[in-house]
Amino acid sequence: MSHKACYTNPGAGVKRPRNDTGNKLTVVLGAQWGDEGKGKVVDLLATESDIICRCQGGNNAGHTVVVDGKEYDFHLLPSGIINSKALSVIGNGVVIHLPGLFEEAEKNEKNGLKDWEKRLIISDRAHIVFDFHQAVDGLQEVQRQAQEGKNIGTTKKGIGPTYSSKASRTGLRICDLLADFKDFSMRFKNLAQQYQAMFPTLEVDVDGQLKKLKEYAERIRPMVRDGVYFMYDAINGPPKKILVEGANAALLDIDFGTYPFVTSSNCTVGGVCTGLGIPPLNIGDVYGVVKAYTTRVGIGAFPTEQLNEVGELLQTRGHEVGVTTGRKRRCGWLDLVILRYANMINGFTAFALTKLDILDVMDEIKVGVSYKLNGKKIPYFPANMDVLQKVEVEYEKLPGWKSDTSACRKWEDLPVKAQNYIRFVEIHVGVPIKWVGVGKARESMIQMF
């Protein structure tokens, strides 16, 4: 478009077309309370991606990926790092615990991860998680337990305190660590002192920490880039497949989740723009990952929870134990109110439905289809936790298929009653299901379209 065309009679109010250019990002997000199997969907898409990004959270996420019979555990590294042909990006919205990053990489190196340093790009605007943030995380949990008789159930990875430092403008970023170290040291000491004033029992070995941080600075220096410019370049350069791997999930989002039992970042689609510094225009497909039943770690309202043999069966058959915490997960029936709510916020292109095979032994399967409050149906998902505790779930009963689906590789292989379950979810949420997972391995994801 010539300059002349842009500025013809500005008073005439001619609407200029927006430049719809550049590569689109494919986004994978959790649609429940986490642990939906996002790592598996990311792994599937990562094989053909050029760039794989993390945009929020820290090493509180837990993704397990199985490749060639080897199991890799990722917490902070994008799980696409196992793709040797792709670049992996840790965006500005991620909080980085440097010892955790290297520990995780070394652990995965033992399983065969190679040359990850050459493929990792770290945004210079990302905030740093210090050891004292992790210590404070633990102390705050103890405090909450003492004051309220309950805690949030954080992973004690320092995520919340780091985002608090960020919001109160006392945090330190990767760019600060790589700039004047004297200035960094002074700000580090001040931050440590602030926390010590709040928590008198907190011990911080300032000099020891700074010495380690100086070493980490040199190790990460080659990986650090201006994240905004890097993403702009990637979007506006030659055609590239860019994938964003969400951590946590919709109901753990700081704004839209079951507050206060949430994480400290936006794990919905808005967090992709703010956590990477990209325009909404460049967001392409947004895939929601949904487990065929519901699980939750820690406390907080859980309307479809089954504190009975159904819950126990799901827990044992599904091996529902947290990757990061090792805690048993609470289990219940699939809740479509949650999925509709997650879709209102994220606008999903399609769902990936995982762990369908866990339901193989059920005679009858229930699905939560709506909530009633004081006898009246409500069209929204309640914000207040006490209100959410009180909702009455209306269920639909579906017959179980009572046969092993773990060997199914295409839609036609699935029992008719399993097909009906899938269609039921699609119709009632209004989002198509693109993949169905029936096992741990890469091959056990049935692609529907």
UniProtKB/Swiss-Prot annotation:
One cellular-component annotation, GO: cytoplasm
Molecular function per GO: adenylosuccinate synthase activity; GTP binding; magnesium ion binding
Cofactor(s) this protein cannot do without: Mg(2+)
Cysteine disulfide links: none
Catalytic site: D35, H63
Details of cofactor binding: Binds 1 Mg(2+) ion per subunit.
Protein residues bound to substrate: D35, V323, T324, T325, G326, R327, K328, R329
Function: Component of the purine nucleotide cycle (PNC), which interconverts IMP and AMP to regulate the nucleotide levels in various tissues, and which contributes to glycolysis and ammoniagenesis. Catalyzes the first committed step in the biosynthesis of AMP from IMP.
PANTHER family the record matches: ADENYLOSUCCINATE SYNTHETASE, ADENYLOSUCCINATE SYNTHETASE ISOZYME 1
Name the UniProt record assigns to this protein: Adenylosuccinate synthetase isozyme 1 B
Organism: Salmo salar (Atlantic salmon)
